[in-house]
Amino acid sequence: MANLKLLLVGIGNPGQKYVHNRHNIGFVILDSLLDSSSVSYQTNSKYSLARTDEDGVTIFYLKPLEFMNLSGKSVAEIAKKNGISPENILIIHDEIDFEFGKLKLKGGGGHAGHNGLRNIVEKLGTNTFFRLRFGVGKPSITSEVPDYVLSNFLPNEKEKIPELVKVSLQKISDWIRERKNGFQKLSDNQ
């Protein structure tokens, strides 16, 4: 039986000054996924990558290390190198169109002005990948969005992040299970 390959991507900006920014919640969630395992990232100048193999499922964990707006290059490279279809990719990212703490798993769709997603769509040549959207809220003045997403979470938000990360991890686990079940059904019918 063939092996199911999945790619989980947390997007954010590299560097210590961005670690606690709203824009980096994708990195936070992806790191939390790996915290409970004995697997660690292998890092080069372009990305950090980890891999697990369990029960016929290979999962790649990717953190592009070029700035968010260039995330698509690493995503496309890892997907192509490992034969991962866009439908088996999950991008974890901040979402300004959602109030803080709202989480939504979505397949396909536009980039809604998110430059990281825009670049991923451009480099993959499709928008059929999945995304876990983590609501970070948004400023009342549109021109303040760049500064807002590069700002740190407020203290009252920061204290809620561990619980929201747990909910995010459950959504990711559910997505993995659905992909695995769908893959097994497809394999059984061949």
Curated annotation (Swiss-Prot):
Reaction(s) catalysed (UniProt annotation): an N-acyl-L-alpha-aminoacyl-tRNA + H2O = an N-acyl-L-amino acid + a tRNA + H(+)
A single BP term in Gene Ontology: protein quality control for misfolded or incompletely synthesized proteins
Protein residues bound to tRNA: Y18, F67, N69, N115
UniProt EC number: 3.1.1.29
The name this protein goes by in its record: Peptidyl-tRNA hydrolase
Marked site positions, Stabilizes the basic form of H active site to accept a proton: D94
Gene: pth
Site residues (Discriminates between blocked and unblocked aminoacyl-tRNA), renumbered to this chain: N13
HAMAP family found in the cross-reference section: Pept_tRNA_hydro_bact
Keyword tags: Cytoplasm, Hydrolase, RNA-binding, tRNA-binding
Gene Ontology CC: cytoplasm
UniProt function note: Hydrolyzes ribosome-free peptidyl-tRNAs (with 1 or more amino acids incorporated), which drop off the ribosome during protein synthesis, or as a result of ribosome stalling. Catalyzes the release of premature peptidyl moieties from peptidyl-tRNA molecules trapped in stalled 50S ribosomal subunits, and thus maintains levels of free tRNAs and 50S ribosomes.
Superkingdom: Bacteria
Subunit field text: Monomer.
Active site positions, chain numbering: H23
Listed GO MF terms: peptidyl-tRNA hydrolase activity; tRNA binding
Subcellular location: Cytoplasm
Family, per entry: Belongs to the PTH family.
